[in-house]
Amino acid sequence: AGRDFHNFNVVYRQNNAYKVVAFTATQIPDIEGRLYPSVLSGELYPNGIPIYDESKLEELISEHKIEEVVFSYSDISHEDVMHKASRVIASGTHFKFLGGEPTMIQSSKPVISVCAVRTGCGKSQTTRKIAEILKASGKKVAVIRHPMPYGELAKQEVQRFTELADLEKHKCTIEEMEEYEPHITRGNVVFAGADYQ
């Protein structure tokens, strides 16, 4: 969860040609049974959008007569993606990826994206090193981190971290603190939250 919310926000939130019926998630504790809240999901979804455990994927496809599943997880291997695609296709449903262009954050500044196949590959360390190199060359640096949806999503719409007190202000989890604190102590501004727009 995290990248899927961003993809929804930029591609589907205001697109009445689609009806998004659910998000699925894995790896995030206690996310099942929660809602992507209406304050974030927009006027087409006044009741929010339910979040289910991925184990219910086939059940959701059948129950809601879903025509298309859009894959939006991050940190996953090709093999795992293809297993998920097989589950969807075996259920008689289209399986889709969104291309880069429609999901990119619009910026007037150059952007460097740091991605990897799974958690633990070194994205955080790589991001800190890139920021260090850019700052040493006189550039201003800000870090954007897709959300870690552990807390109350409506209160995580937009987050800006410039000092350690901001971690408490935004009620960050230990995982979030481990990610943001090294940037803050190095003087990097960190932006996170469920809605970058």
Can you say where each PLM-predicted feature lies in the sequence?
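A solvent-exposed beta-alpha-beta segment
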Residues: 1-67
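Short N-terminal binding/cap micro-motifs at the start of the first secondary-structure element
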Residues: 2-7, 123, 151-153
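Short, solvent-exposed amphipathic alpha-helical segments in soluble enzyme
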Residues: 10-15, 85-87, 130, 158-161
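Hydrophobic anchor at the start of a short beta-strand
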Residues: 20-21, 95, 139-141
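Short, charged/polar "capping" segments at the starts of alpha-helices
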Residues: 28-34, 76-80, 151-153
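Short, basic phosphate-binding NTP loop
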Residues: 38-113
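Walker A (P-loop) phosphate-binding motif
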Residues: 103-151
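ATP-dependent carboxylate-amine ligase catalytic core
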Residues: 133-197
